[in-house]
Amino acid sequence: VFQSNTQETAQTDGAQPVSIMIDGKWTEFPSVQEAEKASLEEYRNALRRNPPTFHITDDNLGNGTLGEKFDRNLAAVRLLKSLEAADRPATAEEQQVLSQYVGWGGMASAFSPDNRRYEQLRSLLTEDEYKAARASVLNAHYTSPTIIRAIYDAAAQFGFENGKILEPSMGVGNFFGMLPERMKDSQLTGVELDSISGRIARKLYPNADIKITGYENTKFADNSFDCAVGNVPFGDYSLHDKRYDKEHLLIHDYFFVKSLDKVRPGGVVAFVTSKGTLDKANPAARRLMAERADLLGAIRLPNTAFKANAGASVTTDILFLQKRDTPPEQLPAWTETGKNADGMELNNYFLQHPEMILGTMQEVTTQYGKDTACVPDPNVELEDLLSAAVLHLGHENVFQSNTLIEDDVFQSNTQEPPAPETADVFQSNTPMEELRPFSYAVQDGKLMFKEADGNLVPSEMLLLLNVLSA
């Protein structure tokens, strides 16, 4: 490329003056070396003005032995610190290296002084970074592209195209990296507690709003996102958040309840979570979720779904919830559990929809005692099972049925949220005082919108008014 831009041939000794294009103008330099330095600086300036956004194309991202993952983690951290020292964005090639960072889940041995790589890791991280990395070995399990793709396929099936997407526990941002082309105009907001992971995510997705803090510290407005996706942390502990402390929620349940508050009525939350969210005997957390949302469906993943890239054998579920505008009159069946033919405790949803269990439920013995696990069929690929399960979810275009103008709602900056599925939309015969919040009606030839507090205001969305008034 450099040679094709020259106006005169440089001599082999580099002393011959040479001209190249810099900022769109031919500029002469005393030597090839000086021209190369100027060209490199121009490239770096262009990179700062328009840094690339990373797109995941490798379905095997993060796979490998513990040693391979450890080495790739170290390479990513070294590169991150080099980029930060130079105060510059990552190139597309450097993003490939950064994207291989998978955190330290399942790598407790890396933090043993007896490990031959221990000193490399210890010298590379600050004291705070080292403590955070060591603390993450139990729950920093990143999500494979196969699972993420299935979640986006389901969102598309529901009718989601573009909008404000929240990822409240993003790691290095695999959900952002797998964002389909058809959803590329979405506004992305991510939250990540771990400093290293969050800083890598910022280098991979420079156009996203990424907050490096605990989700409990965020102050997002309620009803401010169209969709929330992710793989939430799970464990037998709680976070301190004054608004939710009285509910005594375990961390994975907390992420659901808070995210449902942040998503608008009609919006969808799609999270990977522990099977305990649906199967545990205590229904309190599920009832809180049911007060806020309808369960569109759930997919139980085999306990090998995170084995290749996260090194974890754990049974997990993908839950798809659609935000309600008001609580239901009766709590749905999925807030409770029952027993299957083998006497195992399962959520009523899976008892009614066994086709959504991508394996066979069996009793197993773990280091913590007896448990149940979804054991896979070794002859069937997870990708094929997920594709079929997404189709079984149904609920086609529920997002579209909740919108007034299908092509514009998710790109609109209006403060009016789209009408929920059960709202009285465009029913001018309905008395105004009986309209539900977030509903639309025609009054005196004007399209009106009912806010959450009951006030009627003129709607900015006036298309179709002539049809409605005819």
Task: Identify the residue ranges that each predicted region occupies.
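Conserved proline-anchored active-site loop of SAM-dependent methyltransferases
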Residues: R149-F158, N162-P180, G190, D194, ...
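Short aromatic-glycine-(Arg/Gly/Cys) micro-motifs in beta-strand/loop hairpins
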Residues: P17-I22
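Short loop/edge segments at beta-strand edges and connector loops
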Residues: K211-G214, I299-R300
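Conserved Class I SAM-dependent methyltransferase catalytic core
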Residues: S195, K246-K307, V314, I318-L321
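Charged, often flexible domain-edge or linker segments that flank or initiate folded functional domains
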Residues: L40-Q100, V398-F399, I405-D408, N413-A470
